């Protein structure tokens, strides 16, 4: 894998790690999709591409609602404040109230129009020295992007599947087995990408 970026050290957060990858991308105009590895989503690809194709959108943040992974400990998640589909503020690991099932939590997937948008927002994050739990999160960087005047849009996915904790993974496996055993659901364990 010649394009893999190897790190010899632990960096102080995902925003710093992603910066290393950005530095390895030669084309400053290339769009970038950053995502977490501990979840899956079902989403409308056409709806997402319509947001991507609108060149006025600088950043697209994937979010979800109505998922009980956030209900019992909402302080583990980052939350969007919205004006329509425009992101006006991100509350990182800080829940501002209301019912967590009704609020937009961040999936961990973000589209950046190009690496300049990311790096300029990151510079603001570093300048403010804005960390959460001692780490530089990409979620924090979104507030810098908003302050810089970038157009940050929300993209709500249809369904969020969390594997972030051992309990989340066991819950996922339970539902895999359940849906595989009932006749009325199309799920087939033998053809599931994640089981083969």
Regions found by a protein language model. Give the residues of each.
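Short N-terminal micro-motifs specific to bacterial/archaeal maturation
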Residues: 5-8, 12, 109, 160-163
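Domain-scale signature associated with acetyltransferase and cell-envelope carbohydrate enzymes
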Residues: 192-196
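Catalytic-core segments of class I nucleotidyltransferases/pyrophosphorylases
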Residues: 86-161, 167-170, 174-190
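Conserved beta-loop-beta/alpha segment of the NTase-like Rossmann-fold superfamily
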Residues: 1-82
């Amino acid at each position: 894998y010649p394009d893999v970026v190897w790190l010899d050290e632990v960096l102080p957060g995902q925003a710093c790690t992603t910066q290393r990858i950005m530095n390895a991308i030669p084309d400053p105009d290339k769009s970038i999709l950053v995502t977490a590895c501990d979840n899956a989503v079902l989403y409308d690809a056409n709806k997402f591409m319509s947001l991507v194709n609108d060149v006025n959108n600088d950043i697209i943040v994937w979010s979800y609602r109505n998922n009980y992974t956030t209900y019992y400990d909402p302080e583990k998640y980052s939350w969007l404040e919205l004006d329509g589909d425009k992101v006006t503020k991100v509350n990182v690991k800080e829940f501002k109230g209301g019912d967590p099932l009704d609020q937009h939590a961040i999936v961990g997937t973000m589209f950046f129009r190009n690496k300049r948008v990311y790096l300029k927002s990151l510079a603001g994050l570093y300048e403010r020295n804005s960390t959460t739990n001692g780490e530089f999160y990409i979620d924090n960087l979104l507030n810098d992007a908003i302050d810089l005047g970038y157009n940050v849009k929300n993209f709500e996915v249809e369904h969020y599947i969390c594997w972030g904790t051992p309990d989340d993974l066991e819950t996922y496996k339970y539902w895999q087995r359940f849906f595989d055993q009932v006749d009325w659901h199309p799920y087939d364990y033998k053809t599931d990408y994640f089981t083969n």
